[in-house]
């Protein structure tokens, strides 16, 4: 399986659920967290939602994908999310990519690649390691511009806040 750009195939559905992931990312943004959001869909229904809360929860585990996977597993009563699709606003890190493989999620739809920490094609593709017993289809580029703009705005504001705090 490889990373592919989403152009026309199931665009409407992918955009619909990516917009839900963006809503989650905006919750993180409101908490001064890196704005990453995630939803997990099963049979046309969202069964798990999450957004980045690392600073708020003081936990390296409080990533959007991990939270959404926990909620989805609880909702369906199984750790295996074999008939689900995960939508996330930024390419998963190594921890989240590993959790996606472990949860047996067959498909991940991403908005933006993460050249500094991405493990679904940017640095490494954990989701497609043939030696694992499960590989994941990856679709990239759904609402990419909107998500990239939100991330850029967040980091621009963060730099301004840091600069202002140094001058006080």
What are these regions (language model features)?
Residues 32-36, 82:
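Short, basic and Ser/Thr-rich N-terminal targeting/leader segments
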Residues 61-62, 66, 70-103:
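Helix-adjacent hinge/juxtasegments
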Residues 2-31, 79, 95-168:
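Zinc-dependent deaminase
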Residues 36-44:
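Short beta-strand scaffold segments in enzyme catalytic cores
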Residues 53-56:
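A short acidic/small-residue loop/turn micro-motif
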Residues 16, 45, 67:
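Active-site phosphate/pyrophosphate-handling residues
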Residues 19, 38, 70:
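A cross-family signal for key residues in well-ordered alpha-helices
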């Amino acid at each position: 399986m490889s990373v592919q750009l989403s152009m026309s195939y199931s665009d409407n559905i992918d955009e619909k659920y990516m917009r839900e992931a963006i809503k989650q990312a905006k919750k993180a943004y409101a908490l001064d967290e890196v704005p990453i959001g995630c939803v997990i869909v099963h049979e046309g229904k969202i069964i798990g939602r999450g957004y980045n809360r690392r600073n708020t929860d003081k936990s390296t585990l409080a990533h959007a994908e991990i939270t959404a996977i926990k909620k989805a597993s609880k909702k369906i009563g199984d750790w295996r999310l074999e008939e689900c699709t995960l939508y996330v606003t930024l390419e998963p890190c190594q921890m989240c990519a590993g959790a996606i493989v472990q949860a047996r999620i067959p498909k991940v739809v991403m908005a933006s690649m993460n050249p500094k920490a991405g493990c679904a094609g940017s640095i490494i593709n954990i989701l497609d390691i043939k030696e694992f017993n499960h590989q994941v289809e990856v679709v990239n580029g759904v609402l990419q511009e909107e998500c990239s703009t939100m991330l850029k705005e967040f980091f621009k504001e963060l730099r301004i806040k840091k600069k202002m705090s140094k001058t006080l």
